[in-house]
Amino acid sequence: MSVIVLDANAVIMHGRAFPERVHAAVETDAKLVLPRSVKQELVDDVLNAEDAPENHRAAAQAIQELIDEGYLVLRNPDYEAYSDVIDEARRRIANDSLPEHDVKADQYIPALVTELAQNEAVTLVTADRKLRETVREITKRQNVADQVTLSDPLTVL
């Protein structure tokens, strides 16, 4: 079974086809992991926003259904064990236009990928160059880089 971690842009890039592609991936024995921080951003925050556009609400509900049906597995990194990785990721992802306190879901992804890669091969699906570079550097230093593959969203799902 392959373990595939999805970031927010990996979900967004597929648009309305996302549920169909998730079903197809799971049928080929893939385990699709959605970080809880990504779910917060794409589902919870949207459904809690009264002024969210209807198409955003529909997309959020579709993602929630995939979670409820077991097609997407929610995971958090072990915050205590990987707090240094989370802090480093937040610093690396932040820049002049995005202060550290505004870095949201992506800061947890390198820690989750590193944790999962301790026991199995992991594919991170993202088009975000900064996140890719951060994961590449951190997993190399954590001695799990050989267990991690970085893939473009349109090539995996």
Regions found by a protein language model. Give the residues of each.
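Active-site-proximal, substrate-binding regions of enzyme catalytic domains
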Residues: 2-116, 131-133, 137
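Acidic, PIN/NYN-like endoribonuclease modules and their adjacent C-terminal/linker elements
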Residues: 118-157
